């Protein structure tokens, strides 16, 4: 984390948050770990540019990242470890790999992983070692003539002037990127994990190297399943407000259901309503079938829209509280899986509302009806509906 996140960074967080929510919806207890790399070349470069410490840079942007995720209704991870807090674990794992013959220290203290010693290297990315070998430049050209083999990758690197470092048996330095994830995964999830997730750009070499390190150290398979999200591509098409409008339709439907539930004079559902409640179970089935199909959120959202249309048509003023409550419960459960927020936030205070109403009244008295209408529209945009009565202006949140 060396800068503010953009939509491409947020995408995997949202995708895997949805996967997590669905698993929890299905009754699984999910231990969700999302780590932060808080020391690497990009963070150090940013720190030098700003004249501050790497820790200050990473702390600032981790805080901003968490805030942005909260604003997007992404649930906090069960654990969110930071690499710099797990250095000793990295040193221990590297030493284990050296002891087992899978890693070796060079003369300057750099520690490398012996790729060819792990016979299954390339099994995730389906890359062939011979093809990889032919694609590498010579040791002399690459400037890494300490390596036994061009394919070997760094586990520990020596410190450079002005960089953060930690003491180790090999040299003062810092860990390589790949070892960080193996160590934090083992500490918080165990030697063998159920699902490992990330962007498709991480399949090789990062995830491939994680597998090599972890399996050579622990002697068991690293992950049972892998989930990789594709890149987000944005072309020249005009970006519309359709997504926002779609969410507004859902939140409006939820608000109406709450009103029906509260205002209903009849509590228990009629026989016809009970039949319609059975029909609503069909939307749940459609939703689950979509999510079971490789987390097909597009079809899952379509099922939610069908439910909204059904609710708007069938939950009326005379509907029972039971029918309205059940419909709202179904809608809320499905929307929660997708991370959609059904509660409209009260982003305007009562005092502000009263002040604007007073200003509107003054405008009407001055026959400035344009301003009066403008204020009514402003309040409506914020979810406040005005009603002029003989007793004065009444307002309510909608």
Positions of PLM-derived features:
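Alpha-helical recognition segments enriched in aromatics with Gly/Pro capping
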Residues: 1-2, 13-17, 88-258
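Alpha-helix C-terminal capping/helix-coil junction sites
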Residues: 24, 70, 98-99, 227, ...
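N-terminal catalytic cores of NTP/NDP-binding nucleotidyl/phosphoryl-transfer enzymes
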Residues: 1-45, 52, 56, 82-83, ...
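A non-catalytic, amphipathic alpha-helix used as a structural packing/dimerization or gating element
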Residues: 18, 56, 60-67, 249, ...
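Short secondary-structure capping/junction motifs at helix and strand boundaries
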Residues: 70-81, 100-110
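Short phosphate-binding/catalytic loops that engage adenosine nucleotides
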Residues: 28, 102, 384
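A glycine-rich helix N-cap at a beta->alpha junction
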Residues: 62-75, 221-222
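Structural preference for alpha-helix termini/caps and helix-kink/transition segments
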Residues: 238-240, 244-398
